[in-house]
Amino acid sequence: MTIFNGLSESGESKKLNSKIEKQIENASKKDKKIYKVLLLGASDSGKSTISKQIKILNKNGFSQEEIMTFIPVIRRNLLESAKTLVKIIVQKGINLDPLGTHNCEIIEKFNPTPGELINANIGQAITSLWSANSVRSCTYGNDSVLIDSAPYFFSRADEICSRHYVPTIDDILRSRNSTLGISEISFTLDHLQIRMFDVGGQRTERRKWIYCFENVNSIIFCVSLNDYDKKLYERAAPERNRLVESISLFDSIINSQWFMHSSIILFLNKFDLFRKKLEHVPFQDYFPQYEGKNSVKSITRYILWLFVNPSINRAKHNIYPHITTAVDTSNIKVVFSAVKETILQHSLKEAGMF
């Protein structure tokens, strides 16, 4: 029987520190000819989704056992998002019919303990509530703190809450579980051994470990285009715009002494969500200095310029940008064909053969 298992993202800091330091020490002892890639980006930029896509494209995907481990993660994403949705409805004073009000009550009162079965009633309540146009429209704007995949999970609430639920690949790609510390995936590109490290995106994570990767060959930096109207989740800077935070992080990375010789690959990610949001949320409301056309192409170019202009790229790196939708496997397959060429050329250059 499948269960709803609330996963804790907290832990003992000292144990986590020790574990990560041991990972780094072990990594340095391995073959130095291995090409190392560091996957970076602010929280919720899509880094972990990129890691999953690499596993799908280069590691034969997920085993059945691995697929089943995503059930509690996805159910937690769904339930937490549904509770957040109810809070938004209350805060905005959205008028609901009696059924909508009843559904909100069901969602608010549902607080499963670890080991408790999730039931079909909660799935039906979420599906019914999300079907109301007034509810859907109230989520637009920067005051919405829903995760990007919330609408997708709401549309699949009945399936996710089913006793016999088995996650699809799309479910897995859209699941969100904050990266704590470092995760690693190894794969091969044209006989070149790649080790990719995904470092936690939260401020407290990246500050601790970034200096440990001074010999990294390439950096893939992920940016969520969809974050132009959002504020940070983190307590240290709760009012800071998340796109501005990404620019600041990118600045600190590419101009760091540790990465002067690394190739820089920039993923402008979540393009699908960004394009839809621009129809409802004007970019200039959050970046009034932008004076261009209100078009997806013009605004995308402007955001790219914010990252690659000389005041940011003071180290004068060659930056290789790509527009990505991390949940779209076909898109990532095309993008990684180009990334592969960048990595191979850089490896040849390092070997003095290019």
Swiss-Prot record:
GO terms for cellular component: cell division site; cytoplasm; cytosol; heterotrimeric G-protein complex; mitotic spindle pole body; nucleus. Its cofactor is Mg(2+). The keyword Oxidoreductase does not apply. It is a peripheral membrane protein. It holds the Pfam family G-alpha. Residues 33-354 form the G-alpha domain. Residues 194-203 are annotated as: G3 motif. It is found in: Cell membrane. SMART domains: G_alpha. Keywords: Cell membrane, GTP-binding, Hydrolase, Magnesium, Membrane, Metal-binding, Nucleotide-binding, Transducer. Mg(2+) binds at residues 48, 179. It comes from the Eukaryota. CDD domains: G-alpha. Changing residue 90 to A: Constitutive activity; enhances the GDP-GTP exchange rate. Residues 324-329 are annotated as: G5 motif. GO terms for biological process: adenylate cyclase-activating G protein-coupled receptor signaling pathway; adenylate cyclase-activating glucose-activated G protein-coupled receptor signaling pathway; negative regulation of induction of conjugation with cellular fusion; negative regulation of transcription by RNA polymerase II. Changing residue 56 to S: Constitutive activity. Changing residue 149 to F: Constitutive activity. Residues 265-272 are annotated as: G4 motif. GO terms for molecular function: adenylate cyclase activator activity; G protein-coupled receptor binding; G-protein beta/gamma-subunit complex binding; GTP binding; GTPase activity; metal ion binding. G proteins are composed of 3 units; alpha, beta and gamma. Binding of the beta-gamma subunit complex (git5-git11) to the alpha subunit (gpa2) facilitates interaction with GPCR git3. Interacts with GPCR git3; the interaction is direct and leads to activation of gpa2 upon glucose stimulation. Interacts with adenylate cyclase cyr1 (via N-terminus); the interaction is direct and serves to activate adenylate cyclase and cAMP-PKA signaling, to repress sexual development and gluconeogenesis. Belongs to the G-alpha family. This is Guanine nucleotide-binding protein alpha-2 subunit. It comes from Schizosaccharomyces pombe (strain 972 / ATCC 24843).
